[in-house]
Amino acid sequence: MSFKPKNSNAPRSNNSGENTGLFPVPKGGSRKARVSLIVDLGEQNRPDFEDEKTGETKPQKPCQQVAIFADLVNDTVDYGGTIGKQHYRLLLNKQFAGEITGINFMFVPPKDAKGKIIDGKPWTLHPANLMTKLAKAVNKPDIIESGDIEQLLDCPFMAQVEVKEKDSGKQNDKGEPIIYRNVNYKGCSEVPLDDDDEPMQVAELNTPAQCITFQNAKPDDIKFIRKKLIDMIKLANDYSGSNMEKAIKEYEASLNAANDSNSEQEQQEEEKPQATKPAKKPTKKVQEPTPDDSEDGNEPW
């Protein structure tokens, strides 16, 4: 199976993480990684393009976008809950103020240094596109022309990771300062060679690499997609009637059913008659510490 841009076979004309300190974080610097998850975000509307030199704005056509993740295989962290200890999963998309930017997934015509379209050459992924840079880093340059980014899955590379710390001005229940840590992907490079001129060993993934598209999505796949990305997917122009819509609706329905079942069970426990006990002498009540509920519930996995 392959996953290519929608316009890979289209007629062509050459006429001119936020993480907040409440979640575990990896080490910064150059980290060994493998591409672990590709998520189809569908056809997304895009904001107008503004020319930095002239200030002129031009409308941009909607285009297919994706999100790409890599697991840092030397950075095992404890996410807690049902996830437990896993390799740190790093989002490669750009993020700003908590908002995620989709990666444009489309072919573009080749241009010269002056921006003029070159006739007779094949359309490819954009030279500055993250997927183009990844294809070079994993030594699979054919992906740039074929557009089959599913070939990136499980490929090893070196991820440049930036970890920034900021004091929140708050304290936890132990009186310790809460430090916010923002994790950002800054680029990629090839795995370096060892003394025998062979690529250094990169550990395998803990979980199988996946490519979740609007065509192959299943309800069980949706648990791997972050809520913010699900919200983006729901805004896609081609979401309605897609297999992705069906999978998300079934997944969310199963979550709601599980929550309703848990609520009913808790209510039944509360309604059970309690055995009366002899009255005890009043004792001084010790105030329980207030739990920290400041997490936004958007797990980084």
Question: What is the predicted function of each stretch?
Answer:
Residues 1-301:
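Short beta-rich binding modules
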